[in-house]
Amino acid sequence: MRKFREKAETLFDQGAGLVIRFRFVVVLLSIVGALMLASNIRNLQFDTSNEGFLRSDDPILTTYNEFREQFGRDDMLLLAIHSDNIFSLKFLERLRALHENIENEIPNINDMISLINARSTRGEGDVLLVDDLLSEFPETEEQLEKLRSRVMSNPLYQNQLISVDGLYTTLVIESNVYTETGDDDLFSGFEDSGGSHDAVSDNGLSSGKFISDTENSEFVEAVYEVVGKYQSDDFQIYIAGSPAVMHSIKLFMQSDVKKFLRIAILVIGFCLLVMFRRVSGVILPLIVVAVSVASTLGLMAFLGVSFKLPTTILPSFLLAVGVGASVHVLSLTYQGLRRGQQKDLAIRNAYSHSGLAIVMTSLTTAAGLASFSLAGVAPIADLGIFSSIGVMISLWFTLTLLPALLA
């Protein structure tokens, strides 16, 4: 065991000497490699969907996809619109404009329903009549009152399209099951001759690829943009439903990642400053862990792995875990400098004494984190895989980039 340790110390001493000798090449290659990986971060996707918590081969996900193929999406976007006088010409005209604006300008809509295109089913004698509720748009007070009576007396509308007190009405939007991206324009010459109730896309013209979380966010953002044009004191619009909730969670995730990173950098930087009382003692470890985090996230994006709720802790976690190795090296290096050693010798001695401990600590940490890759919940498995990879990337830059920068 002693011989092994002595050989390891010699190996780390020689390795540090080699890095110091070719430090400019090492720094250049490290920067190029990190930039190549980090350049993919712009393609990193945030996934807040329920399906994102399941593995691609999970039987539950397979069953759910079969359900969506047959019955469509089971989550809706709901607009609740408040007014003291819903059955007024001004309100109904604005509701119609909102309905048509959403229908014509927003992508990925499969179906939508409101008072504007609702079906009216009623019996007259022995005859069952089915037509549009607003087949004839009301223009007089008498027609408006008749419409109000029909709507408020119909149990199929109550708490569906109109509240019991008549102060709220809804506009329900169902997005496509399949993505519209990349669809061939095979059906562009055919137009739907049906009424407004059916004048929507045919479930995305089944491309075989389910609508993505990114397209869901674009869909929700487009709805918010249109709603903003109609929002007023006498036309108050509230948005609810799973797509809106998932979009809000995504925004919170993006905000939280940035916030946690800033807090982690400030806290770690402050601790390093108190510990070393040197600018280099603060800047160099932060450079190493920042490059490691950027490379890890870039690798995630390159491999097409989405950022999910549990993985939001990954950047901050890697910052906290990765900085420890740099602290060991810097502490021993500065001790050597205080004893009067030359910088190159102090760096080599630091790696000779701490190199094996740093490697073993990183390996055991990575192995422990990798055990999460066996988890049944996909984001937990992703967290285990990429946190272990991130620890090893951090180790690599600690052994190569850090001594090159120190020299």
Task: Identify the meaning behind each predicted range.
Residues 1-48, 178, 208-407:
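Membrane-embedded transmembrane helical bundles of large multi-pass transporters/channels
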Residues 54, 81-90, 173-181, 203-214, ...:
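Structural beta->alpha junctions
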Residues 76-80, 113, 170-174, 238-240, ...:
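Soluble periplasmic/extracytoplasmic beta-strand elements of cell-envelope proteins
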Residues 61-64, 92-99, 220, 224, ...:
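Extracytoplasmic/secreted envelope proteins and their assembly/folding machinery
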Residues 80-82, 96-122:
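Short amphipathic beta-strand/extended segments in non-transmembrane regions
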Residues 55, 62, 72-76, 107, 109-207, 248-251, ...:
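Extracytoplasmic
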